[in-house]
């Protein structure tokens, strides 16, 4: 077979081979599909054909290069593919072997016949019975490339979308961000005042909030708390007790007022060492010698009410330990809340000792605070306001009787507490005496079990004898509870709410394992 590159163009309507005579063969050899690479080189014949404007020249070349059915044509080389060698001419409307990969259609094709030098156009695709030679002469164009999104990009978008959805479902509440000072609360900082503390606690007593389950642990309605906050601006008027505000709203107001006051009730800067008072004597010395007089008065009145709440723990599920967890972040604060402040960092690492300090004050109030919080303070300007606020309304007589009865219960309970050894758990007090023996035995057993679980964790958290194994022991105990008694452990976590859980996790995660 001759090389196509040796073809040349003679005068019009003639086509001859160079370097030999035409040889007649009975059967031309089968044409082979040219390799796809390297790309085809344009020959002189192809260039002339591309520049030709006469359809007859194209027909002449086609007749010379296509073998006839009778075998009379020479076994010369043929053009590999007319569709791939020619361009559209200016005088011809032929579309040579144009395929579409998308819809499998084909335009008119150029075919040679054995009847003469004519060109026929066919609008239909070649039949399946076409010769192998014709099929081999056709070079299909490459398929159309469809652009699909990158699998890696799609996977990454899905992951990010899933993370955002999980974040918005489990994002912390706005109030919790206020408590952590991540967001600035929409309340103007208040000056710590005994009058406002007295007004809030008086409203709590009138609503009988002491018998509300989860008091100070369950968050109140944010809008109601904001409305109550505005009422504190009018010092002369008491907080109205109506159906618009629940006990949880008033409890939230009390914590908010302590948290947003300009000066903390118990500043961390007053501690001479990072260690917080852990005994009754240390706490009494700290209160008498370190705290300002107004702060002592506010703290005494607040602890007195929290003591009353703890005595109703069989109803409200709030024992001294739970109250310590809820109030420690609001009472013990640093004057400078900048995270880079050393006192702030000490507060974050000693948060459990702060909770224990508040629990100590509640359980030993009469030994730590001497004077009554309602006794006149020398040089105080609040006495006249207090007299106006304490003026009894027709419904206050029942409240005073209840308050007197609660005080008697407190005194009797303290006598019972002091008869127990200091090493015993003070939270397992027989609450049947406080409630006059009322309540079924099942409820009492549940309360004892919950209290025992609280006491067990506090014992683990404060047991220094465990040393470096303290963290692993606590985690192992939590894992065992979750596997063996999951319902009880989940109920324990629900009772702690967000503040207690955060305090527990912060303490565990900051334990040193070295």
UniProtKB/Swiss-Prot annotation:
Gene3D superfamilies: Rho GTPase activation protein
Top-level taxon in the UniProt lineage: Eukaryota
Composition bias, Low complexity: 68-91, 122-143, 421-435
Induction trigger: Down-regulated by Pseudomonas aeruginosa, PAO1 strain and PA14 strain infection.
Location of this chain's protein in the cell: Cytoplasm
CDD domains: RhoGAP
Site feature: Arginine finger: 217
Entry keyword annotation includes Cytoplasm: yes
Keywords: Cytoplasm, GTPase activation
Extent of Basic residues compositional bias: 145-155
Organism for this UniProt entry: Dictyostelium discoideum (Social amoeba)
Protein's GO biological process: signal transduction
Span of domain Rho-GAP: 185-369
Basic and acidic residues bias spans: 401-414
Entry annotated with the keyword Ubl conjugation: no
Annotated region (Disordered), positions in chain: 1-46, 61-91, 105-156, 401-446
Role this protein plays: Rho GTPase-activating protein involved in the signal transduction pathway.
Cellular compartments per GO CC: cytoplasm
Protein name: Rho GTPase-activating protein gacD
MF terms in GO: GTPase activator activity
Biased composition (Polar residues): 1-16, 105-121
